Amino acid sequence: MFAKFDMLEEEARALVRKVGNAVDPIYGFSTTSCQIYDTAWAAMISKEEHGDKVWLFPESFKYLLEKQGEDGSWERHPRSKTVGVLNTAAACLALLRHVKNPLQLQDIAAQDIELRIQRGLRSLEEQLIAWDDVLDTNHIGVEMIVPALLDYLQAEDENVDFEFESHSLLMQMYKEKMARFSPESLYRARPSSALHNLEALIGKLDFDKVGHHLYNGSMMASPSSTAAFLMHASPWSHEAEAYLRHVFEAGTGKGSGGFPGTYPTTYFELNWVLSTLMKSGFTLSDLECDELSSIANTIAEGFECDHGVIGFAPRAVDVDDTAKGLLTLTLLGMDEGVSPAPMIAMFEAKDHFLTFLGERDPSFTSNCHVLLSLLHRTDLLQYLPQIRKTTTFLCEAWWACDGQIKDKWHLSHLYPTMLMVQAFAEILLKSAEGEPLHDAFDAATLSRVSICVFQACLRTLLAQSQDGSWHGQPEASCYAVLTLAESGRLVLLQALQPQIAAAMEKAADVMQAGRWSCSDHDCDWTSKTAYRVDLVAAAYRLAAMKASSNLTFTVDDNVSKRSNGFQQLVGRTDLFSGVPAWELQASFLESALFVPLLRNHRLDVFDRDDIKVSKDHYLDMIPFTWVGCNNRSRTYVSTSFLFDMMIISMLGYQIDEFFEAEAAPAFAQCIGQLHQVVDKVVDEVIDEVVDKVVGKVVGKVVGKVVDERVDSPTHEAIAICNIEASLRRFVDHVLHHQHVLHASQQEQDILWRELRAFLHAHVVQMADNSTLAPPGRTFFDWVRTTAADHVACAYSFAFACCITSATIGQGQSMFATVNELYLVQAAARHMTTMCRMCNDIGSVDRDFIEANINSVHFPEFSTLSLVADKKKALARLAAYEKSCLTHTLDQFENEVLQSPRVSSAASGDFRTRKVAVVRFFADVTDFYDQLYILRDLSSSLKHVGT
């Protein structure tokens, strides 16, 4: 099935030898790529030699000149604007200092440097104006470094003064950091992660008081931080100079002047190379060589020296390298004498593990590493609390993520995806009958974990390019292959095994050495900027090839070809008729994983089992309407958004059942009173929200109640009170949802209004049903108002906008201008009108039996004698509304994208994302409409005698 990869074991063994022989006894080693940022700091070091002041690394200055781009920038990154900002700012600073003091570099024309500075500063200004990923990319120390660089630039040239939208957010981050950190804390003996960024503290720190933190000449293995120390400490540190000279020669720059951003990365590379190879299927005998033992000893000694934990280098401890080191020693069978206990004691927090002490926000991949290290231990049950904690954290992070998962240590979403699948695959395999974690997790948690794995696998499959790679990136493609290989082990993904096998076969050619060509675009590991690690990349290539060559499938043809009536129905819709059969089936399989979770909530609001209605088959259908459209459009809204909307969809069906089966009989003689009940309930819940006393308002109804003012309540009185209680639970669920409470006031106001209209429309329809035609109203008026309000579309859309405002928008208003708001409300009205029309097309027969008002009952349709002709006429009107919706959405998108970007804590470009969410909701609405035309999806009332 797969291309035959010869000599893999020999290549892997050769890589182990290369890694083992790279370790310098004093300085360790690093194969991380050169970075402009650190090179610029090295270029700014000057020294007195024989009475003359000289640049210590003149080659580094020349390196900067060689690397400047045509647009004046230095090494911008396609996935991180922060990288370009840092590189360009640091390089401009170096050029400004050199043009003032050329020292021994007299052969470089000052005029040329000045022109380069002008181009560089112009580029920096443009980059700062466009900088919108300061939070998303989350580079180490960015909140400290960029403000410092801008100050340094202004000190060199008073005309430098940048204004940019994200400046306020950056300074807010800076203030929050400084509130938690005192530079004077570095004078103490205990090392701090801030030692990695001393260049951001010039003028705020007495560098003479931090020299005791030097280890083998470096400040926490950072050339830029060490350069700042060497420049500002007195006396001159020969130890620091020796370290930098070693990095200059032994680093990946090899004397060219380029400096890596971190040196050494000894433990990082040793652990990543070995664990990556062994996790993919290489055995100890495959890798056996003298260097293997020496590597294991080096790792074990690192644990001993740093008291049970390690870092990427000595005395730079973190949870990633500690967990990876534990995993490596376990896989080597040499974990005697090391334990997770020190890691847990140092890095465990309330609901996750810290990467390092003082961390601003948690890392997804760090917690993946912790979980993997614990799951591979023979005594894993001893660490069950930590296993549960990290599993919950990762699951919640995946479910909450809008779009692809992100992590601050890597710019490719494929890397954290791979790690999560590796960890969660172990969870699922070890939770099987007879396995050690069989009773460790409840069914709901395992369902959530399964959804994470399934989504990760499917989205990886869907993202593969025609050439077999992922985004044209060799290393990221290896992550994808390893994700698929791990997924292929699970029964959960059995139906997708043919697609997994085909994708891995297609990727095989990319991984062949002849096509393995990394570029700057493969610099996806992040620290202060971004970098590549040559030996780690080589390990991932071999691991992906090994995993592909080892994978065998036992495909059950019955599973892969299985279909059902609903799936066949979906394939007939315009929206899904062009979707490949396997992709459609995959979305059905993903949807099925949500069904048990949805059923857990079916009685949260309404006691549906006590209502005389047919079985709620729609529960099996609802998840697909959201999952299928999400996968089809590749929108990838958050899984939590999907599930919240599934529940709202379920409640939409249940509220229809409730009004028809319970409210209508109870209020048959007093419909006007039901309007009063609706207003009372909605007003009371809104008051609670406004007053922020949720759950504490006197008189709140939470269950079945009776009116205590009635001495001997009648059956009718009890029924009326219970209906009010049910309505209260429904309104509570919607308006007290955590994301609704954190949405902008504009979105909450719209939801309040639409929810009230929705409930009143049900009451109005109760009255209309008694005559099968509302007197004195035209069809046009009715279908755009009461009828449209009666379907759940408008309030569900408002609910979705609240979620988007609270999560992606961080509380921003979804629609910032009057034009945006008008157009989106117009789109919502077209959606609701179209939805009602299509609903009525599908329910003509049921509405006749149950005496429900339907569009075709209006006099305007009386000229058509056949029901089929009436349906066709209504379908043409629905098509007109859809064309209006399409046009309005296009106008809305144009309006949004022309509006200014709002600087806030919102991640990414909120403008483009909110357009995607609105279009996604419109797709789901359109899909429901297409289904309604093909089949009536609602439950039927059970009449007496049936």
Curated annotation (Swiss-Prot):
GO terms for biological process: gibberellin biosynthetic process. Its cofactor is Mg(2+). Mg(2+) 3 binds at residues 839-840, 843, 847. It catalyses: ent-copalyl diphosphate = ent-kaur-16-ene + diphosphate; (2E,6E,10E)-geranylgeranyl diphosphate = ent-copalyl diphosphate. InterPro entries: Ent-kaurene_synthase_fun (IPR017057), Isoprenoid_synthase_dom_sf (IPR008949), Terpene_synthase-like (IPR050148), Terpenoid_cyclase/PrenylTrfase (IPR008930). Mg(2+) 2 binds at residues 656, 660. It comes from the Eukaryota. Mg(2+) 1 binds at residues 656, 660. PANTHER family: (E,E)-GERANYLLINALOOL SYNTHASE (PTHR31739:SF25), ENT-COPALYL DIPHOSPHATE SYNTHASE, CHLOROPLASTIC (PTHR31739). The Asp-Asp-Xaa-Xaa-Asp/Glu (DDXXD/E) motif is important for the catalytic activity, presumably through binding to Mg(2+). This is Ent-kaur-16-ene synthase. It comes from Phaeosphaeria sp. (strain L487).
